[in-house]
Amino acid sequence: MYRPDHASHTATTAHHDDRVQFLVVADESSLPELEAELALLPLCARGRVFVEVEHPEDVVPLSTPMRMTVTWLSRARRSGRPGTGDRCARGEAATRAVRAWTAEMLCEGPGETRAIVLGGFALVSEVQEHLVAEVGMAPTAVTAAS
């Protein structure tokens, strides 16, 4: 997938990494489904897992492939719209994290990215819309369930 904002990220040597990277996004309402999806990933899978929860105490151990990085996002420790004092709305922390991750990690190249999005309707619809409409991922590369 071509990203004009990443056009300057080329190197003089070829990068032959054609493995699939995974982006997995979930919230506390879908932890059982998240555990099942992570168990189905190949042992050599690589990528990022974002899990949004209400409080830091809601963090639980997850079994993931060795090359997957898990980031827990606590809404209680994040603000809503900057400068308003509003709390972080459900799905907002994960959506922000996905936007930042895609801006940094999705570059033109031989590799493929697949996304698995689980959770509440707002989270799933916003992340799916971002990945397909804004980033340009194929709809078939995004598995979404709310």
What does each model-found stretch correspond to?
Residues 1-146:
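Extended, composition-driven regions rather than compact fold-specific motifs
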